[in-house]
C-alpha cells in the first residue's frame, strides 16, 4: 500500500491520528521536501515523533525516481509525507497515477493546507478564484502566465491566492549544464519581492488587471504560533518586511463582503485609507450596467 499523508501546516503534532497510525506500520517513510516545508519541526523531531527513519524526497527523486518510492509497495506499506494536503501539488497526483498503473493500492490521508487555511485572513473561501504561483524571476526567465488568471478572477470579482516560490536543493543553470551536483542555498520568496514582480508584469502588460493601488493581504507563517497578516495595497506591500517564511499573498477581488473588509481592517496600518482603497477598487472593476436588447438587436 502507498499512503499519501498530509502533515498539516506547521507542527509535528498537526498530523491526524489516522495519518500517524499509518506511518507507524510503514516499512519506508518518505518526506517530500521541495514544494513546502514544515515550519516548526525538523527532520530529527519528526523521526522521534513517528518512531521511524525519514527519507527526504527532493524534486529529482519524486519526478524521475518514483520507481524507488514505489518499489515493493505492492507487498509492503510505504508512506509519502506531504506538508499541507497530499494533493497540493500536481507532482503528487502524478505519483498516484504511476502507482495505480502498477496496480499498487493507494490510500490518501488529508490534512489542512494553505488552500483552506487561507480563510484565517478573514476572506471567505467561496469568494476565491484560480490560485496562481509566483516563481523567482531570473535575468532571462520572467514567466507571466499567472497574470491572465488574476485578470480572469478580478473580472468576476473573485480573490486570488498567490503562492510564493521556495527553492530547496535546487541547482543553478550553470551547474546543471556542467553536470555538477552542487546545490544552491535554500531561498524563500518574500511578500515584497512578490509584489515587485507583480508590478513589473503589470507595467509590461498594461491591461490593468490590477494596479499599484489594488488592495491585498500578506499572509506569513500560516498555521504557526507566529502567523501574521498585513492588509495594504500592492505598492505598500512591496515595501513590507514579512519576516521569516513561509508567505502567501491574496489579491482582493471586486466583491469584497463587508464582513471580509471588517476583518481585513484589523491588519491595516491605516484603516481609513485601506477602506477607501477597497471602495475605489470595487468601483474601478464595477461591471457595466445591463442594457436590455432593443427590437433592432433581435433576430426578428
Swiss-Prot record:
Keywords: Cytoplasm, Methyltransferase, Phosphoprotein, S-adenosyl-L-methionine, Transferase. Disruption phenotype: Resistance to sordarin. Pathway: Protein modification; peptidyl-diphthamide biosynthesis. SUPFAM superfamilies: Tetrapyrrole methylase (SSF53790). GO terms for molecular function: diphthine methyl ester synthase activity. It is found in: Cytoplasm. It comes from Saccharomyces cerevisiae (strain ATCC 204508 / S288c). This is Diphthine methyl ester synthase. S-adenosyl-L-methionine-dependent methyltransferase that catalyzes four methylations of the modified target histidine residue in translation elongation factor 2 (EF-2), to form an intermediate called diphthine methyl ester. The four successive methylation reactions represent the second step of diphthamide biosynthesis. 2-[3-carboxy-3-(methylammonio)propyl]-L-histidine and the corresponding dimethyl compound can also act as acceptors. Present with 13480 molecules/cell in log phase SD medium. The lineage of its organism: Eukaryota, Fungi, Dikarya, Ascomycota, Saccharomycotina.
Amino acid at each position: 500500500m502507498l499512503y499519501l499523508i498530509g502533515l498539516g501546516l506547521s507542527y509535528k503534532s498537526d498530523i491526524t491520528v489516522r495519518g500517524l497510525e499509518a506511518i507507524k506500520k510503514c516499512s519506508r517513510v518518505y518526506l517530500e521536501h521541495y514544494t513546502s516545508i514544515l515550519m516548526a519541526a525538523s527532520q530529527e523531531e519528526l523521526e522521534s515523533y513517528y518512531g521511524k527513519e525519514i527519507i527526504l524526497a527532493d524534486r529529482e527523486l519524486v519526478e524521475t525516481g518514483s520507481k524507488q518510492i514505489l518499489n515493493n509497495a505492492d507487498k509492503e506499506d510505504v508512506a509519502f509525507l506531504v506538508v499541507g494536503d497530499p494533493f497540493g501539488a500536481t507532482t503528487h497526483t502524478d505519483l498516484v497515477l504511476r502507482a495505480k498503473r502498477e496496480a499498487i493500492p493507494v490510500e490518501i490521508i488529508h490534512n489542512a493546507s494553505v488552500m483552506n487555511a487561507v480563510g484565517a485572513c478573514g476572506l471567505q473561501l467561496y469568494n476565491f478564484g484560480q490560485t496562481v504561483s509566483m516563481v523567482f524571476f531570473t535575468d532571462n526567465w520572467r514567466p507571466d502566465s499567472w497574470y491572465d488568471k488574476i485578470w480572469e478572477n478580478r473580472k468576476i470579482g473573485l480573490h486570488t491566492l498567490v503562492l510564493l516560490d521556495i527553492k530547496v536543493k535546487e541547482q543553478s543553470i550553470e551547474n546543471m549544464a556542467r553536470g555538477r551536483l552542487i546545490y544552491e542555498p535554500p531561498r524563500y520568496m518574500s511578500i515584497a519581492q512578490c509584489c515587485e514582480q507583480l508590478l513589473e508584469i503589470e507595467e509590461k502588460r498594461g491591461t490593468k488587471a490590477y494596479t499599484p493601488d489594488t488592495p491585498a493581504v500578506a499572509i506569513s507563517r500560516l498555521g504557526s504560533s507566529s502567523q501574521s497578516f498585513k492588509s495594504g495595497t500592492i505598492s505598500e506591500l512591496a515595501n513590507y518586511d514579512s519576516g521569516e517564511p513561509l508567505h502567501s499573498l491574496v489579491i482582493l477581488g471586486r466583491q469584497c463582503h463587508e464582513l471580509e473588509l471588517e476583518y481585513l481592517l484589523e491588519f491595516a496600518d491605516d484603516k481609513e485609507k485601506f477602506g477607501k482603497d477597497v471602495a475605489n477598487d470595487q468601483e474601478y472593476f464595477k461591471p457595466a450596467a445591463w442594457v436590455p436588447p432593443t427590437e433592432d438587436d433581435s433576430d426578428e
